[in-house]
């Protein structure tokens, strides 16, 4: 007998037919003698619909009241799934986040899980109940409902798995696993049998919409084995785990991130400490900087170029305009018509020539590189947005289609 945590996203429970499909998946694991805990998201577009309803009444509602509203979506899903499982004749109980022991920080709308007290869940499991828990939510020290932000249900599932020392945490989505590229865009993308935590974290951070990056961080921290699979088929999924050196793939995936903008500060005086001042100001405003390029100019000046998330571009520009006035730079230039394309693979750290192959693929596709960033398991390039799809196709063909991976 194993203890299994299963998480189902909004598309998996969007209507009655899908809810009964999930009920069948859950009860099949229960019939095998397993203890089963299920985490659910709100149905379909419920969260967006609730936000729209709020905006009709108040364009700027308090974050506390928004959390009170948004937690209703998961409560509906949990109750409906419990009713479907009851209909099939199995013992089941649904719990809200606070009933399941989730205590969070006080940051409404983007709370962090501080601890999970699993005693109520354990008590229900001891009665041989299937336990359904609302994802995405908890309660803070003021006994107020809080939400964990987008993708929070993934994090809820992993947190429960860690608290219960579960044998496996299954994340059900509308795709059959983790692919070498977006299969909707790259028809020859291949499903991976397994991928390391570090690789999955990089892909999640780069915009691969399979797992939330916070959930992957938590899974790695507590060594929780994840399986990403589809609720619409019964096909085997992708295992996310710590992998051995022999299991490491050279390249695990290609990802494209359009949520990026490039900002350049022109004519920065070439003096010690100015780069520190620039990036510390950005950090104070919670503006995350990714790729950085510094070019030395003439007459004792330099240009500093960096990328930020597109929705933070205006705030970064406003901040840097102040910097220009205070420290003698000549101007700020921004461009959001760019995209970041990356390859990820834990095997590249011990295989020279990967960057060369990537750049060759881009050259052959006539794609110009504006900026480059590298780490042990990732290489990213910034290019024109209109060339993004072509670049991903060319890189995927170079690494996965020509060598038969």
Stretch-by-stretch model annotation:
Residues 1-216, 383-384, 403:
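Nucleotide/pyrophosphate-binding catalytic subdomain
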Residues 239-405:
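A conserved regulatory-domain signal marking ACT and ACT-like small-molecule sensing domains
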Residues 40-47, 228-245, 300, 306:
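Terminal amphipathic helices with adjacent charged low-complexity linkers/tails
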Residues 219:
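Acidic-aromatic/histidine active-site loop/patch
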Residues 34, 90, 224, 287, ...:
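Short phosphate-binding/catalytic loops that engage adenosine nucleotides
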